[in-house]
């Protein structure tokens, strides 16, 4: 009988710094299950002896096909990915709850709006629209703001954006607008950018997009944080009460920490320094217990009120200004828990506009009607089965029963004889006319036509209203964004066509962009189906700066410190930051930290090369007189100061930092936003002052686009 071969000896002890393991014949490490450590198994439950080597014929021979552990592991890896969303592919999800402020029984029979103080579980996914799953966070783009509320009457999905209007009026154009903004099909670039010919060619031939373009070219499209942006339901919906009386409703999420965005040059640099900037910001806020909140506001109106407008309330490219119809707070959304597994929850969550509880109904908005089909249809391809509602993140949290059965990956399988109704066996579930969803019996009439209502035809008036509602800095940013985007368009006639549209919105804006693009002669204003109204008043609610915060709460201060930094001043700054409910990070030449003047050794959060000032809402310079002589020769230190100044941020500095201000080229430009810090009182005053966030009066002098 042949001698039984012995297994290779993989039990030589090895230590890698703090980790104990064993070393195999080839020098590879093996971590062995001991004590209470779980044993690694296959997906079938079989324990695994060696997860570092495949089965071979001899130590240098071919891999054997009988190695079922290898085959299972590679098989699963090869099929890990699912198709990414065709839009909103890059997203970030957070758990929380919705709390009702007061009963809305007069308007809706939806259960979650009946009892003040009642909390309902919620899941929110924030996203960009155009970029792929691996794109950067701070693209100039619309942000998705999709909320799934697990009510006692089923899931309610309010699938919104951070902009209250959209590019198109009819869902049949949705493939076209998305195709145009995605990478061009013959070259597969640019990624997560609208600055290319296809997008602007489509927009320039789609006048209904002009209002949306004003929003996307504004600072709304480059938010500082998910926590500092509004959300909108976009469409007009209906509330329906127990008497089957209908009230039109528009939904608004308003952040309690106020609105805030970045500037374009800052966004570009943030994307290079931290492509996950928005994700990291949300993660850090939740982990530190600073749970972001939004108030849910509604605009409520009836048909008589709607009939007073020159535009159509079914048009998703229009808003009802808050000054015309004030919003009413009806509840709050609090986000307080991160997902336990990104794929299982954030990636597999399925939002559908059709998911509404009894008491909330649809309008005839043609974009909403199309979304109701598309958002259901897309889940089959992406999640692979009609049973995507079996996934825990998508399943209702209320009791549910139905006769839908079988299909791929069915995880909820009913038992018993009955799988249909009506049936004779006395078994449910049964329909309930009283509790069930009842569509509002609106009267409809007219022939079948492929035609758009004339009430949808005014494409420029609200675009103009948005522009004139902005402060001068915000208007500059819109003009600069249009100039930048159109400068990337290679086809001159497309640029000229867009300028012709801009002249209809605001003549000064159109000429400014045209001159910046180098047009020798201005085109004629584009033909308009309806002339631009000049009598619409500015709406301050449309401005970020006018709706910005009053405090530094929720923001982050970057403190650049070196060996010998003033320890007392640093302690005072940290105390002031914490009192303001803000955050801070210490940046030092080395991540190992620095020794303050009082002898304390303090660890840094970031090394200077990895912590540029673009990552912070305001900065403080705390070098020592000795260390600053070396710091002034470091390019990243000079950039830290110059960028903060150019981006109109507040800069606090100790007296020893003056040489750094000089080398950064701003010593002769100091203004009310550059503040010397000397003691605890000045530190506290600085934290109060920086609640304004930006010194916009500085912007014309820095001439930074």
From Swiss-Prot:
It catalyses: 2 H2O2 = O2 + 2 H2O. It comes from the Bacteria. Gene3D superfamilies: 1.20.1370.20, 3.40.50.880, Catalase core domain. Induction: A threefold increase of the activity arises after exposure to heat stress (37 degrees Celsius), to sodium chloride or ethanol for one hour. Not inducible by hydrogen peroxide. Its cofactor is heme. Residues 1-31 are annotated as: Disordered. GO terms for molecular function: catalase activity; heme binding; metal ion binding. The active site is at residues 88, 161. This is Catalase C. The gene is katE.
């Amino acid at each position: 009988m042949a001698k039984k071969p012995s297994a290779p000896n993989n039990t030589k002890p090895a230590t890698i710094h703090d980790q104990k393991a064993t070393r195999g014949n080839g020098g590879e490490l093996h971590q062995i299950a001991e004590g209470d450590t779980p044993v690694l198994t296959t997906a079938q439950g079989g324990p695994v002896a060696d997860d570092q080597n495949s089965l071979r014929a001899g130590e240098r021979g071919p891999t054997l096909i009988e190695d079922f552990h290898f085959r299972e592991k590679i098989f699963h890896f090869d099929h890990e990915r699912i198709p990414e969303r065709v839009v909103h592919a890059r997203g970030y999800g957070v758990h929380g709850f919705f709390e009702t402020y007061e009963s809305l029984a007069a308007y809706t029979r939806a259960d979650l709006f009946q009892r003040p103080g009642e909390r309902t579980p919620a899941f929110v996914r924030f996203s960009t629209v155009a970029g792929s799953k691996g794109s950067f966070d701070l693209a100039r783009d619309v942000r998705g703001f999709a909320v799934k509320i697990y009510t006692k009457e089923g899931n309610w999905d309010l699938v919104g954006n951070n902009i209250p209007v959209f590019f198109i009026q009819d869902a049949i154009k949705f493939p076209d607008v998305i195709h145009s903004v995605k990478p061009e099909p013959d070259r597969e670039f640019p990624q997560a950018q609208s600055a290319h010919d296809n997008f602007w060619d489509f927009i320039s031939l789609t006048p209904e997009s002009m209002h949306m373009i004003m929003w996307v070219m504004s600072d709304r499209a480059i938010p500082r944080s998910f926590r500092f942006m509004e959300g909108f339901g976009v469409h007009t919906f209906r509330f329906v009460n127990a008497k089957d009386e209908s009230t039109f409703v528009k939904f608004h999420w308003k952040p309690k920490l106020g609105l805030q965005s970045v500037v374009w040059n800052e966004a570009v640099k943030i994307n290079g320094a931290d492509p996950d900037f928005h994700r990291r910001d949300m993660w850090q806020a939740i982990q530190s217990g600073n749970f972001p909140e939004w108030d849910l506001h509604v605009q409520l109106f009836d048909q008589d009120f709607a009939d007073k407008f020159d535009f159509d309330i079914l048009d998703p490219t229009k808003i009802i200004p808050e000054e015309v119809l004030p919003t009413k707070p009806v509840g709050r959304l609090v986000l307080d828990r991160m997902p336990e597994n990104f794929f299982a929850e954030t990636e597999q969550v399925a939002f559908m506009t059709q998911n509404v509880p009894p008491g909330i109904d649809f309008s005839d908005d043609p974009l909403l009607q199309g979304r109701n089909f598309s958002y259901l249809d897309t889940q089959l391809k992406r999640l692979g089965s009609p049973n995507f509602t079996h996934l825990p993140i998508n399943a209702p949290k209320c009791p549910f029963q139905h006769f839908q059965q079988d299909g791929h990956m069915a995880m909820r399988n009913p038992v018993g004889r009955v799988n249909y109704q009506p049936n004779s066996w006395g078994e449910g579930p049964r329909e309930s006319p009283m509790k069930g969803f009842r569509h509002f019996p609106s009267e409809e009439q007219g022939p079948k036509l492929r035609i758009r209502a004339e009430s949808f035809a005014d494409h420029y008036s609200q675009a103009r209203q948005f522009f004139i509602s902005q402060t001068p800095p915000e208007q500059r940013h819109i003009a600069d964004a249009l100039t930048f985007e159109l400068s990337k368009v290679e086809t001159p006639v497309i640029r000229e066509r867009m300028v012709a549209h801009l002249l209809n919105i605001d003549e000064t804006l159109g000429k400014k962009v045209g001159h910046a693009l180098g047009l020798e002669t201005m085109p004629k204003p584009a033909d308009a189906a309806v002339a631009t109204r000049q009598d619409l008043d500015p709406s301050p609610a449309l401005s970020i700066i006018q709706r910005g915060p009053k405090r530094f709460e929720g923001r982050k201060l970057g403190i650049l410190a070196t060996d010998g930094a003033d320890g007392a001043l640093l302690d005072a700054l940290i105390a002031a930051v914490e009192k303001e409910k803000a955050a801070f990070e210490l940046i030092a030449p080395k991540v190992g930290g620095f020794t303050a003047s009082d002898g304390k050794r303090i660890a840094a959060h970031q090394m200077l090369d990895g912590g540029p000032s673009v990552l912070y809402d305001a900065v403080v310079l705390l070098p020592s007189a000795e260390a600053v002589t070396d710091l002034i020769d470091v390019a990243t230190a000079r950039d830290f100061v110059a960028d903060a100044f150019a981006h109109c941020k507040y800069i606090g500095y100790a007296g020893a930092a003056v040489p750094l201000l000089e080398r950064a080229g701003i010593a002769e430009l100091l203004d009310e936003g550059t503040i010397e810090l000397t003691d605890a009182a000045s530190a506290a005053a600085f934290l109060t002052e920086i609640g304004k966030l930006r010194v916009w009066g500085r912007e014309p002098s820095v001439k930074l686009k």
